[in-house]
Amino acid sequence: MENLEQTCASLRAQIAATEAQLAGLKRELEIAEQAAEVKAQSTTRTITAEDGKTNETREWPLLSEEYKRYGRQMIVPQLGLQGQLKLRAARVLIVGAGGLGCPAALYLAGAGVGTLGLVDGDTVENSNLHRQVLHRSKNVGTFKVDSAIEYLRELNPHPTYVPYRAHLTPQEAPGIFKDYDIVLDCTDNPATRYLISDTAVLLGKPLVSASALRTEGQLMVLNYPPRPVGDKSGGPCYRCVFPKPPPANSVVSCADGGILGPVVGTMGVLQALEAIKVITSPAVNPSASPPSLLIFSAYSTPLFRTIRLRARRANCAVCSADASVTLETLKNGSTDYVFFCGVAGLEATLSPEERISPLEFKKRHPKEVPQDGGRINKEPTIIDVREKVQFDICSLENSINIPISTILSSASSPTNVDANAQPSLPFWLPRELASADSTDPIYVVCRHGNDSQIAVRRLKELGLDRGGQRYVGDIQGGLRAWREQIDPDWPEY
């Protein structure tokens, strides 16, 4: 019996290893097929005259339909026929098919770019639809690259569209980038931004990078002109502009900070414009086109500001003569972007005793206000630490709003272990909470259950737990868990 169990275990292990190897081979095959599709792009076409007067065959640079389609932009002096031919021959890679990538891809496909590659491993969600203009309601749940390409093919069937249904990795990035002429960074996290920039520099690809959050956006054209590593006349890279990544806990996503669709759309359209300029312009003169950072602010006057960037840094880790980041370090994994950028973690993680589920909260406190209007003993106080704009969207009955930003901006007092002492409390605390006589429990809630933990720690540092006589804890999982466990009609935003 023991031998049979060992045999079964060995066979299971072999099957698992074989399946893993097969998955890797399938991924390699997909990349190879995509590369072959890119290289199969035709460069010349023979057109038959359609004037109804002759059957002669003539060599025209574009199809008759292309002249009609692109005529309005071809008569722009900065573009012309030669510019259109450059666009048709161009191979553009867009990393990220979201709020930036959708408008960028839309206008590049419309302009007649020959090959358009899209890299994204995410699927379409309802929360994407207000700003990611290539995706439609019927495509929720499908890969973003497939949803985008479906739309783009209806818009313009002439370009070759190449999907990459996975998130970009250091090992695969060089193999993908090498088949393209220019790269657009349309992502929203620092680790991927550094990876995209490093790969673009090492392979000599110009990079158009943009970002957007709330009502503001930024745009840069990097590694342009794309000179070899160590050549000071080349354009700066992302590391030249930002040698050190931002603190992991300071990075705010669109899901947490919010984003206006027209803002991210503006930045994506500007990315497409800059890509067209790079593709169609003659050889660039670095002194005539100094690198710059374009800043867009929707609620400021003027809307746009430009800051001139410095040249390549002499000690840059990727584009200087002493570069430590190489194609080899990418492929072997020794350049760890997640480690370099750090992982955002909770500043304060609470113990199980300091946390309570929404269901348990409702069991302990079935009524927040007694029916007779009187005040019951141990009446809970719910502090909602979301920002006011979110609190105004929806809030728990009788909860009070003290934004986490307000809590963190105040100086902490040492934990007060003396129940009879009067701690120095900040102005934003309601009088009933600041009262030394109150021992009613305090429950802190936020959107997902992260900020509430930090807030609980701060409140205890301020002495609100009365040396352990008063319960101060958070509602685990936040309002998302409240929706799942208590109120399925709670607004999900």
Curated annotation (Swiss-Prot):
Reaction catalysed by this enzyme: [molybdopterin-synthase sulfur-carrier protein]-C-terminal Gly-Gly + ATP + H(+) = [molybdopterin-synthase sulfur-carrier protein]-C-terminal Gly-Gly-AMP + diphosphate; [molybdopterin-synthase sulfur-carrier protein]-C-terminal Gly-Gly-AMP + S-sulfanyl-L-cysteinyl-[cysteine desulfurase] + AH2 = [molybdopterin-synthase sulfur-carrier protein]-C-terminal-Gly-aminoethanethioate + L-cysteinyl-[cysteine desulfurase] + A + AMP + 2 H(+)
Localization per Swiss-Prot or TrEMBL: Cytoplasm, Cytosol
Residues at which ATP binds: G99, D120, S127, N128, L129, H130, R131, K144, D188, N189
Active-site residue numbers: C254, C446
TM spans (from-to): none
Binding site for Zn(2+): C237, C240, C316, C319
Keywords noted in UniProt: ATP-binding, Cytoplasm, Metal-binding, Molybdenum cofactor biosynthesis, Multifunctional enzyme, Nucleotide-binding, Nucleotidyltransferase, Transferase, tRNA processing, Ubl conjugation pathway, Zinc
Cofactors, names only: Zn(2+)
EC number(s) recorded for this UniProt protein: 2.7.7.80, 2.8.1.11
Record-given protein name: Adenylyltransferase and sulfurtransferase uba4
Gene Ontology terms: cellular component: cytoplasm; cytosol
Gene Ontology biological process terms in this record: cell budding; cellular response to oxidative stress; invasive growth in response to glucose limitation; Mo-molybdopterin cofactor biosynthetic process; protein urmylation; regulation of pseudohyphal growth; tRNA wobble position uridine thiolation
Domain Rhodanese: 376-491
Gene3D superfamilies cross-referenced by the UniProt entry: NAD(P)-binding Rossmann-like Domain, Rhodanese-like domain
Comment on bound cofactor: Binds 1 zinc ion per subunit.
Function statement: Plays a central role in 2-thiolation of mcm(5)S(2)U at tRNA wobble positions of cytosolic tRNA(Lys), tRNA(Glu) and tRNA(Gln). Also essential during biosynthesis of the molybdenum cofactor. Acts by mediating the C-terminal thiocarboxylation of sulfur carriers urm1 and mocs2a. Its N-terminus first activates urm1 and mocs2a as acyl-adenylates (-COAMP), then the persulfide sulfur on the catalytic cysteine is transferred to urm1 and mocs2a to form thiocarboxylation (-COSH) of their C-terminus.
Pathway: tRNA modification; 5-methoxycarbonylmethyl-2-thiouridine-tRNA biosynthesis; Cofactor biosynthesis; molybdopterin biosynthesis
Molecular function as annotated in GO: AMPylase activity; ATP binding; identical protein binding; metal ion binding; molybdopterin-synthase adenylyltransferase activity; molybdopterin-synthase sulfurtransferase activity; nucleotidyltransferase activity; thiosulfate-cyanide sulfurtransferase activity
Family of this protein: In the N-terminal section; belongs to the HesA/MoeB/ThiF family. UBA4 subfamily.
PROSITE patterns: RHODANESE_3
